A protein has these predicted regions:
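Rossmann-like dinucleotide/flavin-binding elements
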Residues: 70-99, 105, 141-148, 160-170, ...
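Surface beta-strand/loop "capping" patches
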Residues: 65-73, 203, 254-264
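Short, hinge-like loop/turn segments at secondary-structure boundaries
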Residues: 2, 22-24, 114-118, 234-237, ...
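Flavin-dependent oxidoreductase catalytic cores
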Residues: 1-76, 80, 84, 88-91, ...
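Conserved acidic residues
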Residues: 2, 7, 155, 191, ...
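Rossmann-like dinucleotide-binding cores of NAD(P)H-dependent redox enzymes
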Residues: 95-135, 184, 207-254, 310
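Short beta-strand and adjacent tight-turn residues that come in two discontinuous sequence segments
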Residues: 6, 142, 253
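Feature captures the FAD/FMN-dependent oxidoreductase FAD-binding
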Residues: 126-166, 257-266
Length: 330
């Protein structure tokens, strides 16, 4: 059993045993239980790992050795993509400035690790932050980059500004509580909650609330929950089991037409229905923060947009794009 459990961790960091022996546990890239490795295997592909871009590609994707050439890199955004880009740049011997608008690093990993059954994701934040600090990345917190303060000479700029919760044109949408705010303990919810959106974030938030004795209903316009989620079947089945075991109710094929602070009205099959509640949680998705892209392209020769700033996706795409954006630098 222990060897089976270790197998995933060995994909995340094959040097795990050596780091443990040397008492460098803080340098171990943690398995977050996303099962991207299994998804790859079940799809007939070679195995890959969300937190390790070199998994099964140690030679193909190895970093060029530092040659003494100094390069200056600007990273905008301190989420997983930005942190991995900064770490990779320092490992290549480059100078790095990382600017993050919030007061801490981590980005959307914080809400991703918010549910009671996904705490392993928080270990990834700690690992990435530790590597940034050990490598002396020049980190600027509470420092949003805008068109008015963008300055400096950089050989490459990485736009990794992440994403922002979407606000579709539904009457009353501005009265909702963001699922990301709930999952990061910036907002509380009442006993009876309606969650709009049953993708991964909405379903996980609903399960977390239900696990705290909440009365939760998911309202989803698609035919089923997790309809567009591209994740491993194991994770899908596990999350559906939590939905069932915790008594989360589901209203699928439901188009939300109106929201108040204590109700959600939706249409289905020509009929209009209203759910009363204490709190309405908004989990309808995210949109990329890429407004600086055109300005960066005008000012700098090398610009790479990565992670959720391209489109809201997975931890895997964020980590891998952060690594490869720096790996390919000449």
């Amino acid at each position: 059993f222990r060897l089976c459990r270790l197998a995933h961790q060995m994909l995340a960091d094959p040097y795990w045993p050596k780091k443990v022996k040397a008492h460098h546990e803080e340098d171990i890239a943690p398995c977050v239980g996303c099962n991207e490795c299994l998804l790859a295997g079940f799809s007939g592909k070679h195995y890959y790992c969300a937190v390790n871009p070199l998994c099964y590609a140690e030679k193909a994707y190895a970093l060029p050795l530092p040659n003494g050439q100094k390069r200056n890199v600007l990273v905008i955004g301190g989420g997983p993509a930005g942190m991995m880009a900064a770490i990779t740049a320092k490992r290549r011997g480059f100078d790095v400035d990382l600017y993050e608008k919030e007061d801490k690093l981590g980005g959307t990993l914080w809400p991703a690790g918010g549910p009671d059954f996904k705490a392993d994701v928080l270990k990834l934040i700690k690992y990435l932050e530790t590597q940034c600090k050990k490598l002396d990345v020049n980190i600027h917190l509470n420092s949003p980059i805008t068109k008015d303060n963008l300055e400096g000479d950089y050989d490459k700029v990485i736009l990794a500004a992440g994403s922002t919760p979407a606000m579709p044109p539904i009457p009353g949408i501005d009265t909702t509580v963001l699922a990301s705010d709930y999952l990061t303990h910036q907002a509380t919810v009442g006993k009876k909650v309606v969650v709009i959106g049953a993708g991964l974030a909405g379903t996980e938030a609903a399960c977390d609330i239900a696990g705290k004795d909440g009365d939760v209903t998911l309202v989803e316009m698609c035919p089923d929950i997790l309809f567009t989620a591209n994740h491993c079947l194991n994770n899908d089945q596990h999350l559906r089991k939590i939905v069932k075991d915790r008594g989360v109710k589901v209203e699928a094929n439901a188009k939300v037409t109106n929201i108040t602070p204590t109700s959600v009205t939706f249409e289905r099959d020509g009929k209009t229905m209203t759910l009363e509640c204490d709190t309405v949680l908004n989990a309808v998705g995210f949109r990329p923060n890429n407004q600086l892209e055109d300005l960066l392209d005008e000012k700098y020769d090398e610009v790479a947009v990565i992670g959720d700033a391209v489109a809201p996706r997975k931890i895997l795409t964020a980590i891998h794009e952060g690594y490869h954006a720096i790996r390919v630098m000449e």
